[in-house]
Amino acid sequence: MSLANISFCELKRKEVINLRDGARLGAVCDMEIDRCTGTVCSIVVPGPPKLWGLLKSDEELVIPFCKISNIGDDVILVDLVL
């Protein structure tokens, strides 16, 4: 599945997994788009929760589009060195 034929609503339902260590990074919460070209620059996932998971993190993990390896039916695979 390519990003050319996927809606943001579908993208938000997918879990992001890092290929390097198998870590679950969370679900897509936002994306950044280049205003001039209209292309997707990056996807954004929320950072790790605070206070035993009770509070949302102030940090976000911005994943450049070039780091996306594959977009499957249920997950997005990324290749990140964290």
Task: Give the ranges of each region predicted by the language model.
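Peripheral interaction segments used for macromolecular assembly
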Residues: 1-82
